[in-house]
Amino acid sequence: MSVLTPLLLRGLTGSARRLPVPCARVHSKPPREQLGTMDIAIGLTSCFVCFLLPSGWVLSHLENYKKRE
Protein backbone atom coordinates (compact mmCIF):
# COMPACT_ATOMS: atom_id res chain seq x y z
CA MET A 1 0.00 0.00 0.00
CA SER A 2 1.24 3.43 -0.75
CA VAL A 3 1.43 6.34 1.62
CA LEU A 4 -1.39 8.13 -0.20
CA THR A 5 -3.94 5.32 0.21
CA PRO A 6 -5.18 6.38 3.68
CA LEU A 7 -5.51 9.98 2.49
CA LEU A 8 -7.51 8.93 -0.55
CA LEU A 9 -9.79 6.72 1.51
CA ARG A 10 -10.32 9.48 4.06
CA GLY A 11 -11.20 11.85 1.23
CA LEU A 12 -13.78 9.42 -0.15
CA THR A 13 -15.46 8.74 3.17
CA GLY A 14 -15.27 12.30 4.49
CA SER A 15 -18.18 13.56 2.38
CA ALA A 16 -20.33 10.60 3.40
CA ARG A 17 -19.93 11.43 7.09
CA ARG A 18 -21.56 14.84 6.67
CA LEU A 19 -24.74 13.49 5.07
CA PRO A 20 -27.77 13.50 7.38
CA VAL A 21 -29.20 10.11 8.20
CA PRO A 22 -33.01 10.07 8.14
CA CYS A 23 -34.61 8.82 11.32
CA ALA A 24 -37.44 6.36 10.79
CA ARG A 25 -40.54 7.05 12.82
CA VAL A 26 -42.16 3.66 13.26
CA HIS A 27 -45.27 3.39 15.39
CA SER A 28 -47.49 0.40 15.85
CA LYS A 29 -50.72 -0.36 17.59
CA PRO A 30 -50.89 -2.59 20.63
CA PRO A 31 -51.64 -6.24 19.84
CA ARG A 32 -55.27 -7.26 19.42
CA GLU A 33 -54.83 -10.10 21.88
CA GLN A 34 -51.97 -10.95 24.20
CA LEU A 35 -49.99 -14.13 23.62
CA GLY A 36 -50.25 -16.61 26.43
CA THR A 37 -47.60 -18.91 27.80
CA MET A 38 -49.05 -21.88 25.94
CA ASP A 39 -49.00 -19.99 22.61
CA ILE A 40 -45.34 -19.11 23.07
CA ALA A 41 -44.48 -22.68 24.09
CA ILE A 42 -46.23 -24.09 21.00
CA GLY A 43 -44.44 -21.59 18.75
CA LEU A 44 -41.00 -22.34 20.17
CA THR A 45 -41.61 -26.10 20.03
CA SER A 46 -42.72 -25.96 16.40
CA CYS A 47 -39.64 -23.89 15.46
CA PHE A 48 -37.42 -26.43 17.22
CA VAL A 49 -39.08 -29.39 15.49
CA CYS A 50 -39.07 -27.77 12.03
CA PHE A 51 -35.57 -26.29 11.98
CA LEU A 52 -33.26 -27.57 14.68
CA LEU A 53 -34.24 -31.23 14.77
CA PRO A 54 -33.53 -32.02 11.07
CA SER A 55 -30.27 -30.06 11.07
CA GLY A 56 -29.17 -31.83 14.25
CA TRP A 57 -29.95 -35.19 12.69
CA VAL A 58 -27.89 -34.35 9.60
CA LEU A 59 -24.97 -33.13 11.71
CA SER A 60 -25.03 -36.24 13.87
CA HIS A 61 -24.96 -38.50 10.77
CA LEU A 62 -22.35 -36.45 8.89
CA GLU A 63 -19.77 -39.24 8.93
CA ASN A 64 -22.25 -41.56 7.20
CA TYR A 65 -22.68 -39.06 4.39
CA LYS A 66 -18.92 -38.78 3.86
CA LYS A 67 -18.53 -42.52 3.18
CA ARG A 68 -18.75 -43.67 -0.41
CA GLU A 69 -20.67 -46.89 -0.75
UniProtKB/Swiss-Prot annotation:
Biochemical pathway: Energy metabolism; oxidative phosphorylation
**Motif SIFI-degron: which residue numbers?**
2-19
* Keyword terms of this UniProt record: Membrane, Mitochondrion, Mitochondrion inner membrane, Transit peptide, Transmembrane, Transmembrane helix, Ubl conjugation
- After translation, how is this protein modified? In response to mitochondrial stress, the precursor protein is ubiquitinated by the SIFI complex in the cytoplasm before mitochondrial import, leading to its degradation. Within the SIFI complex, UBR4 initiates ubiquitin chain that are further elongated or branched by KCMF1.
Bilayer topology reads: Single-pass membrane protein
Taken from the record's topology, the Mitochondrial matrix segments are: 26-36
Please list the GO biological process terms of this entry: mitochondrial electron transport, cytochrome c to oxygen
Q: Does Transmembrane helix appear among the keywords?
A: yes
Give ranges for the Mitochondrial intermembrane compartment. 61-69
Q: Name one GO cellular component term.
A: respiratory chain complex IV
Asked if the record carries the keyword Cytoplasm, the reply is no
Give the residue range annotated as the organelle targeting sequence: 1-25
Record's SUPFAM superfamilies? Mitochondrial cytochrome c oxidase subunit VIIIb (aka IX)
- Highest taxon above the source species: Eukaryota
Q: Where in the cell is it found?
A: Mitochondrion inner membrane
Give the transmembrane region(s).
37-60
Name the major location: mitochondrion
Q: What is the similarity comment for this entry?
A: Belongs to the cytochrome c oxidase VIII family.
According to its UniProt entry, the function of this protein is described as: Component of the cytochrome c oxidase, the last enzyme in the mitochondrial electron transport chain which drives oxidative phosphorylation. The respiratory chain contains 3 multisubunit complexes succinate dehydrogenase (complex II, CII), ubiquinol-cytochrome c oxidoreductase (cytochrome b-c1 complex, complex III, CIII) and cytochrome c oxidase (complex IV, CIV), that cooperate to transfer electrons derived from NADH and succinate to molecular oxygen, creating an electrochemical gradient over the inner membrane that drives transmembrane transport and the ATP synthase.
Q: How does it assemble?
A: Component of the cytochrome c oxidase (complex IV, CIV), a multisubunit enzyme composed of 14 subunits. The complex is composed of a catalytic core of 3 subunits MT-CO1, MT-CO2 and MT-CO3, encoded in the mitochondrial DNA, and 11 supernumerary subunits COX4I, COX5A, COX5B, COX6A, COX6B, COX6C, COX7A, COX7B, COX7C, COX8 and NDUFA4, which are encoded in the nuclear genome.
The name on file for this protein is: Cytochrome c oxidase subunit 8A, mitochondrial
Q: Which organism is it from?
A: Otolemur crassicaudatus
